[in-house]
Amino acid sequence: MKMPVRSVQLPLPASVREIAAAIAFASLVVGCSSDPSRVVGPASLGDPSGGSTTGPAGASAGNPMNGAIFWVSSSSPARRTADSWRASRPADASQLDKIAAQPHVFWLGSWNREVRADVDAVMRTMSEGGALPVLVAYNIPQRDCGGLSGNTGTTPSAYRAWIAEFAAGIGSRRATVILEPDALAGIDCLTAADQSQRLALMSYAVETLRASGSVSVYLDGGNPGWRTAATMASRLARSGIALAQGFALNVSNFIGTSENVAYGSELSSLVGGKHFIIDTGRNGRGAAPDKQWCNPAGRALGPTPTARTNIALVDAFLWVKAPGISDGACGGASAVGEWMPEYALGLAQRAAY
């Protein structure tokens, strides 16, 4: 059963700090996928006008993130909560530091009305200290099949213009872009004509983002519990994977790293040996036994973000969805996109580190 979406429309603020806060607030509309095997996460993680970088990280040959360092927010929900707990709950604050100390990616979507300016602002901040910005483009028409994370106002022509502005915001700077989580794995709800149109839009996005030669693109690759590798390979082949660096797995999901590596390796063999990244933010204990996707109990933080995976085809482990952000108001939990400090604490406490 789908839950209603809270529509959030915000004007573009003047400063980088205000832009980040506005985008973070707008991220409340992003949450559970219409397919119960996945959850789509928050649009951003705090304020990119203040932070640090983490790294350096080594990587295997053919990895554009080789040697990259990644940006860490100084004002993420985890950082703010940890700091507020420092005196009264010192042990718990130390646990939340496990989340606060790690880099996260920045989501941009339909809430970005001036996407070129927003991308430029985020790029300028996230690249401070030589860090590699990692962004998510999340605005494909009929996103989430009109479900909780839908964007009914985006048309194909508007999307092309949006992607062109997104690419212009990056310019010639180096960046990694995760392209449209759910767009390919979740395409089945569309008509045949709309499916063809989506594949064409994905191809356009890859070509546009890659035009500068400085952007590495990873297309939606779903996860091991959703579509077969053969199905995803066919969709990737028709979506511009030949021009992309590779694909992204497990975005906002809980499936364990080893399962993703096995699935990704099979998928890679079907798409010309392309590399992939894995969202490991919440997969430390794998998926819940009942496959619950909405704030499942007993989960844990997974491997921390790094480009030093020691796995030839895996370019990076990244926390694409911020651990502790609600998947939805299931079982009395906070609304989708809201920060849940106690849930985040549990993820941290159960981590293997």
Go through each PLM region and give its residues.
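Structural preference for beta-strand elements that scaffold enzyme active sites
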Residues: 105, 130-134, 174-178, 214-218, ...
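C-terminal motif of bacterial Sec signal peptides marking the signal peptidase cleavage site
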Residues: 28-31
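Active-site cleft segment of glycoside hydrolase catalytic domains centered on the general acid/base Glu
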Residues: 149-174, 181-215, 229-231
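Ser/Thr/Gly/Pro-rich low-complexity, disordered linker/stalk segments of secreted
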Residues: 38-61
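Bacterial signal peptide processing site
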Residues: 33-36
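Bacterial N-terminal signal peptides that target proteins for export
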Residues: 3-20
